[in-house]
Amino acid sequence: MAQADIALIGLAVMGQNLILNMNDHGFVVCAFNRTVSKVDDFLANEAKGTKVVGAQSLKDMVSKLKKPRRVILLVKAGQAVDDFIEKLVPLLDTGDIIIDGGNSEYRDTTRRCRDLKAKGILFVGSGVSGGEEGARYGPSLMPGGNKEAWPHIKAIFQAIAAKVGTGEPCCDWVGDEGAGHFVKMVHNGIEYGDMQLICEAYHLMKDVLGMRHEEMAQAFEEWNKTELDSFLIEITANILKYRDTDGKELLPKIRDSAGQKGTGKWTAISALEYGMPVTLIGEAVFARCLSSLKEERVQASQKLKGPKVVQLEGSKKSFLEDIRKALYASKIISYAQGFMLLRQAATEFGWTLNYGGIALMWRGGCIIRSVFLGKIKDAFERNPELQNLLLDDFFKSAVDNCQDSWRRVISTGVQAGIPMPCFTTALSFYDGYRHEMLPANLIQAQRDYFGAHTYELLTKPGEFIHTNWTGHGGSVSSSSYNA
């Protein structure tokens, strides 16, 4: 007899925790795993005493579901998702729903959405953020795909999502086809940026200010009471305080080679594809790439010279406040760039995205959760057509208030030989964005000189002109040479 409200396939820790979360909110969940013994183990241990039911096969699982059947896939992105979909489709009926909760590439989600729509199956690709803890007690959920599915999953999704403010769920419908997974991808890219910015602040504290771990931990704890209040600042303070079994700080013992799963890279690639200068996330990805060259860096450190020791001007306390302001200003730039990419993607794919709603989805439950996101939500509520966060009065004023500190930090860091790829690219973007005239006119002249690519005059927009710069060429308007 059909009794389960929803099924979940994939009993790794995330899957188990999401099932227990749904159970806590009164939903009956059917659990399935490719290795069936894992279902029995889960029911006998973590799910003991709950209403969770198990299935011994996909057919058994489908038979236990109320209609329309709702199935969440929480398996490795890629071929595994397609394999399960292929096995599920013959067992499902028109109007049934498959939900992919993994970190799938948004184009795959769009393809699956279209393929399944032709077969009468409703497909949803949902970003799920917050890690194992979030899955258990309230993640940020970013569903997109076939909107006909939303009324049938909304109650479950919004019940289990993190809550902020007066109980607003960090979950709402994002948009058509791959929109949900695109938004999750950008979220992950911003996460890369936030983490790298914090690392650069830590590097400056350690090597310019010579702060001890307990001093740095205290600084981050204080910062967490300001506009930087966020999950990542909070855990950074905890990491700096943490001591190993020998009583010494653990952090200095950790190999300085950062891993990555690829979603930051996807964001940077998408930015290039859609012509958006999402420079900070790109630099955050490259910083991890550089960190992975550990052996080369060890050799280079013995051969390549840097600047002499720089004497810090002013007090350590005032420079620490400068670092805080530089971090805040750079963070604003990162989010401004992320939302630029979302806006461009919406134009490319015809999505109707609620940018304030997206900020709310990220406000709780996820890795980038912060008070700061509430300010972004407010900005888009004031002006839903806001072209760039930097043009909102609140953020314009915030950056202006931080600007002198930001420039001092970068100047001091450069003179001290501290790598600050994200601090510096953030300021470069800000300066570029606020310039009415950039030297790109010279690039256009160069392109026309060697490739006859033409240019426009400021006084004649829309009219493309080629100049015979040497007197030897013809007056062709373009050539096969591109740059």
Swiss-Prot record:
Substrate binds at residues 103, 129-131, 187-188, 192, 261, 288, 447, 453. GO terms for cellular component: cytosol. It is found in: Cytoplasm. Pathway: Carbohydrate degradation; pentose phosphate pathway; D-ribulose 5-phosphate from D-glucose 6-phosphate (oxidative stage): step 3/3. The modification N6-acetyllysine is found at residues 38, 59. The modification Phosphoserine is found at residues 57, 129. GO terms for molecular function: carbohydrate binding; carboxylic acid binding; NADP binding; phosphogluconate dehydrogenase (decarboxylating) activity. It comes from the Eukaryota. It catalyses: 6-phospho-D-gluconate + NADP(+) = D-ribulose 5-phosphate + CO2 + NADPH. The active site is at residues 184, 191. The keyword Acetylation applies. NADP(+) binds at residues 10-15, 33-35, 75-77, 103, 478-481. SUPFAM superfamilies: 6-phosphogluconate dehydrogenase C-terminal domain-like, NAD(P)-binding Rossmann-fold domains. The keyword Phosphoprotein applies. Its EC number is 1.1.1.44. InterPro entries: 6-PGluconate_DH-like_C_sf, 6PGD_dom2, 6PGDH_C, 6PGDH_Gnd/GntZ, 6PGDH_NADP-bd, 6PGdom_BS, NAD(P)-bd_dom_sf, Pgluconate_DH. Catalyzes the oxidative decarboxylation of 6-phosphogluconate to ribulose 5-phosphate and CO(2), with concomitant reduction of NADP to NADPH. Belongs to the 6-phosphogluconate dehydrogenase family. Homodimer. This is 6-phosphogluconate dehydrogenase, decarboxylating. It comes from Mus musculus. The lineage of its organism: Eukaryota, Metazoa, Chordata, Craniata, Vertebrata.
